[in-house]
């Protein structure tokens, strides 16, 4: 595993705030109606506070995972996602027979919201019974959010790195539906594997 300082990790992890980036994107696209924008704005601010705590080393990686998942539980994300045009997204996505189609997304600045976040973001479009390739991460906090469809999700702790393989231990094995998320860090649930159990399946990912 490559070496990285805590400060360098925190800077990367700050850019990995999945929920902040997704909702920021939806705000840009005016995907939310006026009746839900105040709720979403509060949510964004709370998520940004979590990112600031992580950046300032006031929060551990695992605590960040727990808080992000807890915050998801406080808002009916499935209801908010009804304001997103997933039908259009499904019509435009060209699903592949193997693996997942990666759809790049971008958005301009939003007045009044934090800027200068550095992160990678994408939406995975997956056919039924196809998977995002199982993988693990080094020096990264990342997360997946189910936008549409259902998935069989598996996570593993990364116990030890050997010269030509890694030793892992199962931690999560369950179904994931719209609005549910999972998180990853160096210390918890590092390896993950998502297989679509309905079509189309869409996952929003920040890495």
What is the meaning of each model-derived region?
Residues 1-17:
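N-terminal secretory signal peptides and thylakoid transit peptides that target proteins
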Residues 23-62:
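C-terminal segment of N-terminal export signals and the immediately downstream linker at the start
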Residues 98-128:
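A short glycine-rich, His/Asp/Glu-containing loop-to-beta-strand
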Residues 122-137, 186-188:
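Conserved short histidine dyad/triad with adjacent acidic residue
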Residues 141-152:
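Glycine- and acidic-residue-biased ligand/ion/polar-headgroup-sensing regions
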Residues 143-145, 198-207:
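A short hydrophobic beta-strand segment most commonly corresponding to one strand
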Residues 160-188:
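Short acidic-glycine-tyrosine-enriched beta hairpin
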Residues 193-196:
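Asparagine-centered strand-capping/turn motif at beta-strand->loop junctions
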